[in-house]
């Protein structure tokens, strides 16, 4: 009969503690948290939102089984100069965004900070254009200011 993997007995606590401490590092979420990898490689640098300038409008093809072109914009962040792709929500709201507009982006809310649904490689969405909520412009409640 093979032996046990874990030590057991009255004085095994220290050994168990050391083992747990060592094998915790095999857990990817623990490792990411301890080494600060999310903040290190995050374009928003850990912030909930970021300001950026629209470089161009792009269409991203949806993943199977859907057939659609999701309207997105390429945004250069003001804080660090990184360029990210951001999804433009709401029907026809891409018409309210022009190149060189200032937009506020936030995370799209996918699993584990990744992309959401059928939009591949897009982790952010536009929430404001030139300081006004995209939703308010789309609803006709406010007008988009010209810069």
From Swiss-Prot:
Keyword Ribonucleoprotein: yes
One Pfam family here: Ribosom_S12_S23
The entry's keywords: Ribonucleoprotein, Ribosomal protein, RNA-binding, rRNA-binding
Top-level taxon: Archaea
Gene3D superfamilies recorded: Nucleic acid-binding proteins (2.40.50.140)
One GO cellular component term noted in the UniProt record for this chain: small ribosomal subunit
InterPro entries: NA-bd_OB-fold, Ribosomal_uS12, Ribosomal_uS12_arc, Ribosomal_uS12_euk/arc
Cystine connections: none
MF-aspect GO terms: rRNA binding; structural constituent of ribosome
Gene Ontology biological process: translation
Alphabetized NCBIfam families for the sequence: PRK04211.1, uS12_E_A
Protein family: Belongs to the universal ribosomal protein uS12 family.
Function: With S4 and S5 plays an important role in translational accuracy. Located at the interface of the 30S and 50S subunits.
Subunit composition and interactions: Part of the 30S ribosomal subunit.
Name of this chain's protein: Small ribosomal subunit protein uS12
Organism: Pyrobaculum islandicum (strain DSM 4184 / JCM 9189 / GEO3)
Lineage summary: Archaea, Thermoproteota, Thermoprotei, Thermoproteales, Thermoproteaceae
Gene designation per UniProt: rps12
């Amino acid at each position: 009969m093979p032996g046990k993997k874990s030590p057991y007995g009255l004085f095994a606590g220290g050994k168990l503690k050391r083992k747990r401490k060592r094998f915790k590092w095999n857990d990817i979420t623990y490792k990411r948290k301890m080494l600060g990898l999310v903040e290190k490689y995050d374009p928003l640098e850990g912030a909930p939102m970021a300001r950026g300038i629209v470089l161009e409008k792009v269409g991203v093809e949806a993943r199977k089984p859907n057939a659609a072109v999701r309207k997105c914009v390429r945004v250069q962040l003001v804080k660090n100069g990184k360029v990210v792709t951001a999804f433009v929500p709401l029907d026809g709201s891409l018409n309210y965004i022009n190149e060189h507009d200032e937009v506020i982006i936030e995370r799209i809310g996918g699993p584990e900070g990744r992309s959401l649904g059928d939009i591949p490689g897009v982790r952010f969405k536009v929430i404001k254009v030139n300081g006004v909520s995209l939703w308010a412009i789309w609803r006709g409640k406010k007008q988009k200011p010209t810069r």
